[in-house]
């Protein structure tokens, strides 16, 4: 580690800001399908108006969504509980719905109207959520049918290479620089999950 104990304490007590720079987006077999889709814009299939990227917390969904936001000048919403059809009708730019959670009770008829408006207006929508949206406990059959037409892309659990890159990035976000041996040591001993990576970084 290249910081002493005192400076480390000061940094950890300071509110750090996550960055969503393209250069810090690490393509890997775990996430390359999602990243390839974002990189291929605007050469998306005509019928690919709504895309959902899903995976566990910390898997980089927000990073990918924010890269696309900058690329297409999209409007991003954290959840949709406060939205109305008026919002959708009035916005002519691509949309992002962030962090749809599987155990939340969503207004299904309103969602169905949202999705129909996106398609009929030839707009684009990117959704991020914690699980495959087809596994949500939807009741409205028309909504289920509509969701089944989405491009649904999973971000898988990290492999060893991605774990090390995420560790380096998260420490860097906190203005900490650790040597390669220490990163290697951590990566070989933690659970293969994004949550475990976040927990280790928070502890250190």
Each language-model region and where it sits:
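Conserved AAA+ ATPase "sensor/coupling" helix adjacent to the nucleotide-binding pocket
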Residues: 161-177
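Conserved P-loop NTPase "ATPase switch" module shared by AAA+ and STAND
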Residues: 88-108, 114, 121-130
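A short, basic N-terminal segment
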Residues: 1-40, 44-46
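The conserved phosphate-sensing helix
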Residues: 190-202
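Short conserved motifs of the RecA-like P-loop NTPase core
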Residues: 177-189
């Amino acid at each position: 580690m290249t910081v002493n104990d005192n400076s480390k304490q000061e940094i950890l007590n300071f509110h750090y800001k996550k960055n969503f720079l393209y250069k810090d987006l690490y393509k890997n077999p775990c996430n390359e399908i999602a990243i390839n889709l974002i990189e291929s814009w605007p050469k998306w299939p005509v019928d690919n108006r709504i895309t959902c990227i899903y995976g566990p917390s910390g898997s980089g969904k927000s990073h990918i969504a924010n890269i696309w936001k900058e690329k297409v000048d999209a409007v991003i919403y954290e959840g949709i509980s406060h939205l109305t059809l008026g919002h959708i009708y009035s916005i002519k730019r691509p949309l992002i719905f962030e962090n749809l959670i599987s155990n939340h009770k969503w207004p299904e008829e309103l969602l169905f109207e949202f999705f129909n408006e996106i398609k009929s207006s030839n707009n684009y929508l990117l959704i991020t959520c914690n699980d495959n949206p087809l596994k949500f406990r939807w009741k409205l059959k028309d909504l289920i049918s509509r969701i089944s037409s989405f491009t649904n892309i999973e971000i898988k659990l990290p492999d060893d290479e991605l774990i090390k890159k995420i560790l380096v990035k998260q420490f860097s976000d906190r203005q900490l620089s650790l040597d390669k041996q220490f990163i290697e040591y951590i990566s070989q001993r933690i659970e293969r999950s994004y949550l475990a990576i976040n927990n280790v970084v928070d502890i250190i």
